[in-house]
A protein has these predicted regions:
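A short, N-terminal "cap"/entry segment at the start of jelly-roll beta-barrel domains
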Residues: 1-23, 36, 142
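N-terminal regulatory/effector-sensing and dimerization cores
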Residues: 19-116
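Amphipathic alpha-helical segments enriched in hydrophobic/aromatic residues interleaved with Lys/Arg
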Residues: 106-159, 163, 189-191
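A ubiquitous short alpha-helical element
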Residues: 119-127, 174-177, 204-205
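N-terminal positioning helix adjacent to the helix-turn-helix/winged-helix DNA-binding module
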Residues: 128-131, 135, 156, 178-189, ...
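Alpha-helical structural elements of signaling/regulatory helical domains
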Residues: 131, 145-148, 181, 198, ...
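Basic/polar phosphate-binding segments, predominantly the helix-turn-helix DNA-binding elements
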Residues: 163-168, 176, 192-196, 200-238, ...
C-alpha cells in the first residue's frame, strides 16, 4: 500500500522528532511524536501532507482537519493555532512543498486548467487521491539518492503541483490578477509582509498600496485571512521572532529590533501574550 511505503520511508529518514528542511529544493519532511492541545505556528504558502496522525487548525468559524485523507493548501503565509494528534508509536509523519510560482505558471500555460474569478485565496483542505499518493511516493523515494534528487525530484514536484492545481481548491496555489484583482492585491500584500517582516506597516499605507479605501481593505483582508491587517503584521513579526530566538547566541533585545520593534518592553509584552512566556525564556543562551 502506497501510504505504508511513504510512512516507512519518512520514518527511516527522520529517526528522531523534528523537521528536515529542503531535503530536496522546496520540500520539507517532518515528524511529531507528541499530541499538543494548542500550538501556534506560521505556515508558508504551499501544500502540507500528513501520512500518519492528524492536525486541526482552529479558525474562528470552523475547524480544518488534515490527515492521511486530506491535505492542506495555503495561498499565503498564514499564522494558525493547531491541535496535534500523535502517539509515541504512531507519530505524525508529513511533508511540505513550496508553491513555486514559476512551476505553477508553466503548468497553467500548458494546460486547460482555469478558475472562477470569484474563487478566494485562503487556507483549504482537499482530498488526497491515489494519483497524488503515487507521485508523493516516487518523490520520497528520491530523497536518499543524490542523482534522483537532482534529476527526478523536480519532475515529481511538478506532477504533484499539477494534480493539486486540478483539484477543486487548486486556485489557492495561484493568485494572479487575471482571476480577481482585489483578491490578488490582498494575497500579494500578505506575501510582502511575510517577506519584509522588519518593515513598519500602517493600514492606510497598505490600503493605498492595494488601491482600496481603508475600510474596504480592512474588511476584505479580514474576510480572507481571518484577522485584521495589523493583527496579521503583529503575528508575522512575532512568529519570525520566535524562529530567530531558537538560534544560538542571540538576545531578546536584538531579535526585537530585527523584527521591527522600537520598544523592547512592548515586544516582551506582546510576545508573552501570544506564546505564554517571555522571549528571554525562549533564548538558547
Amino acid at each position: 500500500m502506497l501510504i505504508k511505503n511513504i510512512r516507512k520511508s519518512i520514518n527511516d529518514i527522520i529517526e528522531d522528532e523534528g523537521t528536515i528542511k529542503n531535503i530536496v529544493d522546496g520540500v520539507d519532511i517532518f515528524k511529531i511524536s507528541k499530541s499538543q492541545e494548542s500550538v501556534k505556528q506560521c505556515y508558508k504558502k504551499g501544500i502540507i501532507f500528513i501520512f500518519q496522525g492528524k492536525k486541526e487548525i482552529l479558525n474562528e468559524k470552523s475547524i480544518l482537519t488534515y490527515d492521511e485523507n486530506n491535505y492542506l493548501i495555503l495561498s499565503m503565509a498564514t499564522p494558525v493555532e493547531c491541535r496535534v494528534y500523535a502517539e509515541d508509536d504512531k507519530p505524525i509523519l508529513g511533508l511540505r512543498i513550496d508553491a513555486d510560482q514559476k512551476i505553477i505558471n508553466d503548468i497553467l500555460f500548458n494546460s486547460n486548467i482555469s478558475y472562477s474569478n470569484e474563487s478566494k485565496p485562503g487556507i483549504y483542505t482537499e482530498s488526497l487521491n491515489n494519483n497524488l499518493l503515487d507521485s508523493l511516493n516516487r518523490l520520497i523515494n528520491c530523497f536518499n539518492n543524490e542523482e534522483y534528487s537532482k534529476i527526478l525530484a523536480p519532475l515529481y514536484i511538478k506532477e504533484i503541483l499539477y494534480f493539486v492545481l486540478k483539484s477543486p481548491h487548486g486556485y489557492a496555489l495561484n493568485y494572479s490578477s487575471y482571476y480577481n484583482e482585489n483578491y490578488y492585491s490582498i494575497s500579494k500584500i500578505a506575501d510582502d509582509i511575510y517577506i519584509n517582516y522588519k518593515e513598519k506597516y500602517d493600514i492606510n499605507t497598505l490600503a493605498k498600496t492595494a488601491n482600496m479605501s481603508t475600510s474596504y481593505f480592512h474588511n476584505l483582508f479580514k474576510e480572507i485571512t481571518g484577522m485584521s491587517p495589523i493583527q496579521y503584521v503583529k503575528k508575522i513579526k512575532l512568529h519570525k521572532a520566535r524562529e530567530l530566538l531558537l538560534s544560538p547566541k542571540i538576545t531578546a533585545k536584538s531579535v526585537a529590533y530585527e523584527v521591527g520593534y522600537d520598544s523592547l518592553s512592548q515586544f516582551n509584552r506582546e510576545y508573552k501574550r501570544m506564546f505564554g512566556h517571555t522571549p528571554k525564556d525562549e533564548c538558547h543562551i
